[in-house]
């Protein structure tokens, strides 16, 4: 078959397949043009999932009648210009668009009408393109002083085969909504409105430039919960700036759909950035949970290539390691600064669950019959009414409140705290001299309050200044042990304790081989072992932090970790996985009764330890209930 030159209409339709994949893609290109035109307000309408009709109106600089026919020519744009040497540099791009493909591509597969009034002009003009056929420029009505109105009807009518690959109208409408949300998050100083089939879906007024305006826009798009649980990010390294907001580890999702990344104001989906985000949270979330974030990378245009994807959805960095390191470092710095803070949604979900209960004591029946109605208070005083005899109530769980803390400990509390640390597997660590160590704990003095009770030998109940805190003792102590092990590992190695009698652990031969192959790494974590014949290892030393631990169970869990992740993870990540497993074994277990000093020692350590708001698997270590919320439960508010 001989080589042929394709006609312009076919070329444009091929280009449209790359640039205009679906209605949301067309809207993205039109919104990009509006932003480049300096618009402060952008209105978007879509009907029939965007296939029937799309309208994008803006108050930008507009187009003159001479520019209208040029705007729909392929590779014609106002966003690139030659430098002093006559060179067209594609690395110095400061606009959203630059290819000059969007309008001709859309016009080749749909009915496209552009109406515009240039800034300072008296008259408005329009041009119509149908399936690649260009009409004449003609005078037109235009509602605003300047700007453009671009209407797209019957998208893909000229390429019926493409229509077969479209999803349902609902799915296309959701994609359009998501696209406008991304554009709105990238441009907080621009007002956006979106109507789907005549129904207002979004209405976002312009916000002031800066972190507060950006956070207000993110709250309007992602919800107030994100605003309440977001950490501000603002770090710069070697000319690259990372700003934005990232959610607390306990404010996570089941997928990565709530991760928004922007490079020089451009929404992108970049694997490097997403991988960096995962790495930053790897220490705080389970593998099936994902963080929430809206991150903005700003750098010189010469350091990033945006001309690597037809729809400009991907970018390529000149120094990807620098960008990845900045993201990981900045996020971990912010997470460390959050201390023991946990997501507010944890308490909200708990309260919602309580409110949903129809009966607070299912299956419980009162064990007495009320007496006759009294004649009144005066009759009671005169002996005319005797209150009924009430038998003790047998409420489910009432007798399982396993420990109660008295308001005052008396004596040398510092000594009691030392014993608490020993009992809580902090034997080799001198206790912290907390303020007021020789006086009763006052809930006003501490963020996590003063312990009042232990429930079901699992949960610590503490009174705070304006509410109460419920702590999962195992999850909290697991994070404390983990953080200390990481600190010791970073400073030269985890302190070991020698077993009086070395313990032989039987394993599968393949498991034993994997564990022995990592013996040097494990020794750095305080676990010293060696081969003891086929399918067995001999444990000589264990981490001192773990106290008295089940060495066999620990080694078997480590063998499972290495089997699952040993080849896939880097050395540092492997060590952290093993650290996490060890910390789980060395933690205060659920079902263990703690005394008052032990509980308060755990609370004080949580307050002093970064990341203590969640365990190693991303679950919350405590739930805080404000007094106002408790009063609402009882109808006092």
From Swiss-Prot:
Q: CDD domains this protein is in? A: HATPase_MutL-MLH-PMS-like (cd16926), MutL_Trans_MutL (cd03482)
Q: Which Pfam families match?
A: DNA_mis_repair, HATPase_c_3, MutL_C
Please give one Gene Ontology molecular function term for this protein: ATP binding
Q: Which GO terms describe its cellular component?
A: mismatch repair complex
Please give the family membership noted in the entry.
Belongs to the DNA mismatch repair MutL/HexB family.
Tell me which PANTHER family the record gives. Answer: DNA MISMATCH REPAIR PROTEIN MLH, PMS, MUTL, DNA MISMATCH REPAIR PROTEIN MLH1
| Stated role | This protein is involved in the repair of mismatches in DNA. It is required for dam-dependent methyl-directed DNA mismatch repair. May act as a 'molecular matchmaker', a protein that promotes the formation of a stable complex between two or more DNA-binding proteins in an ATP-dependent manner without itself being part of a final effector complex.
The name on file for this protein is DNA mismatch repair protein MutL
Q: What is the native source organism of this protein?
A: Caulobacter vibrioides (strain NA1000 / CB15N)
The gene name on file is: mutL
């Amino acid at each position: 078959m001989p080589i042929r030159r394709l006609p312009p209409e076919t070329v444009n339709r091929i280009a449209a397949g790359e640039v205009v994949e679906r209605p949301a893609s067309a809207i993205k290109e039109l919104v990009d043009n509006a932003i480049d035109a300096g618009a402060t307000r952008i209105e978007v309408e879509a009907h029939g999932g965007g296939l029937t009709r799309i309208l994008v109106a803006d108050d930008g600089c507009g187009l003159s009648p001479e520019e209208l026919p040029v705007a729909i020519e392929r590779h014609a744009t106002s966003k690139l210009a030659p430098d002093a040497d006559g060179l067209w540099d594609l690395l110095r791009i400061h606009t959203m668009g630059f290819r000059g493909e969007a309008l001709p591509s859309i016009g080749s597969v749909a009915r496209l009408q552009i109406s515009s009034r240039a800034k300072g002009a008296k008259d408005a003009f329009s041009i119509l393109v149908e399936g690649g056929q260009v009409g004449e420029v003609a005078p037109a009505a235009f509602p605003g002083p300047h700007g453009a109105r671009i209407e797209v009807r019957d998208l893909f009518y000229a390429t019926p085969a493409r229509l077969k690959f479209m999803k349902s109208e609902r799915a296309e409408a959701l994609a359009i909504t998501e696209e406008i949300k991304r554009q709105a998050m990238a441009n907080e100083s621009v007002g956006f409105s979106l109507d789907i089939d005549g129904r207002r879906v979004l209405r976002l007024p312009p916000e002031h430039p800066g972190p507060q305006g950006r956070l207000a826009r993110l709250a309007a798009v992602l919800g107030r919960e994100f605003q309440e649980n977001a950490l501000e990010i603002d770090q710069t390294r070697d000319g690259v700036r990372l700003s934005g907001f990232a959610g607390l580890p306990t404010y996570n999702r089941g997928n990565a759909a709530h991760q928004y990344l922007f490079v020089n104001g451009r929404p992108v989906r970049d694997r490097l950035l997403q991988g960096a985000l995962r790495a930053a949270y790897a220490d705080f979330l389970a593998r099936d949970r994902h963080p929430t974030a809206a991150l903005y990378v700003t750098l010189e245009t010469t350091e990033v290539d945006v001309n690597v994807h037809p729809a400009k959805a991907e970018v390529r960095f000149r120094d990807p390691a620098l960008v990845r390191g900045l993201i990981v470092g900045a996020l971990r710095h912010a997470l460390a600064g959050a201390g023991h803070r946990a997501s507010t949604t944890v308490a909200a979900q708990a309260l919602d669950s309580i409110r949903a209960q129809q009966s607070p004591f299912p299956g419980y029946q009162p064990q007495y019959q009320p007496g006759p109605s009294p004649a009144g208070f005066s009759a009671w005083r005169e002996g005319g009414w005797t209150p009924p005899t009430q038998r003790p109530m047998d409420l489910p769980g009432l007798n399982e409140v396993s420990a109660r803390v008295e308001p005052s400990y008396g004596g040398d509390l510092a000594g009691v705290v030392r014993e608490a640390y020993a009992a809580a597997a902090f034997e080799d660590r001198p206790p912290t001299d907390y303020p007021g160590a020789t006086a009763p704990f006052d809930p006003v003095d501490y963020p996590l309050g003063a312990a009042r009770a232990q429930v079901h030998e699992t949960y610590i109940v503490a009174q705070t200044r304006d509410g109460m805190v419920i702590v999962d003792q195992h999850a909290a102590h697991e994070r404390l042990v983990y953080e200390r092990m990481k600190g010791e590992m970073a400073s030269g190695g985890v302190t070991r304790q020698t077993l009086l009698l070395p313990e032989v652990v039987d394993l599968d031969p393949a498991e034993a081989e994997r564990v022995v192959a990592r013996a040097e790494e494990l020794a750095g974590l305080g676990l010293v072992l060696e081969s003891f014949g086929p399918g067995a290892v001999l444990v000589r030393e264990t981490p001192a932090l773990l106290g008295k631990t089940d060495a066999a169970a620990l080694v078997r869990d480590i063998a499972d970790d290495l089997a699952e992740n040993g080849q896939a993870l880097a050395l540092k990540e492997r060590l952290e996985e093993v650290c996490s497993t060890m910390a789980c074994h060395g933690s205060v277990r659920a079902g263990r009764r703690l005394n008052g000093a032990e509980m308060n020692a755990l609370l004080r350590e949580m307050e002093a330890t970064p990341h203590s708001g969640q365990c190693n698997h991303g679950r919350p270590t405590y739930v805080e209930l404000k007094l106002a919320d408790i009063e609402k439960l009882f109808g006092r508010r």
